[in-house]
Amino acid sequence: MMNMKPTESYEQLDNSALEQVVGGKYYGNGVHCTKSGCSVNWGEAFSAGVHRLANGGNGFW
């Protein structure tokens, strides 16, 4: 967290600028997909799986 910029240095986007942002989709379980493919954050995916097992198959997201 030490390398984060202070909040004053971020620029807030209005709706028209936000419509121009191109990004991927995050599925809430460690999986991220873009046009070029998907990637997995295995630590987050493992935690999501453990949470699902612990609460009877219901996701925590």
Curated annotation (Swiss-Prot):
Keyword Disulfide bond on entry: yes
InterPro entries listed in its UniProt record: Bacteriocin_IIa, Bacteriocin_IIa_CS, Bacteriocin_IIa_dom_sf
GO biological process: defense response to bacterium; killing of cells of another organism
GO cellular component: extracellular region
Subcellular location: Secreted
Gene3D superfamilies hit by this protein: 1.20.5.130
Any matching Pfam family: Bacteriocin_II
Residue stretch(es) of the prosequence: 1-24
Disulfide bonds: C33-C38
Family matches, as PROSITE patterns: BACTERIOCIN_IIA (PS60030)
Keywords: Antibiotic, Antimicrobial, Bacteriocin, Disulfide bond, Plasmid, Secreted
Stated family: Belongs to the bacteriocin class IIA/YGNGV family.
General function of this protein: Inhibits a wide spectrum of lactic acid bacteria.
Protein name per UniProt: Bacteriocin leucocin-A
Phylogenetic classification of the source organism: Bacteria, Bacillati, Bacillota, Bacilli, Lactobacillales
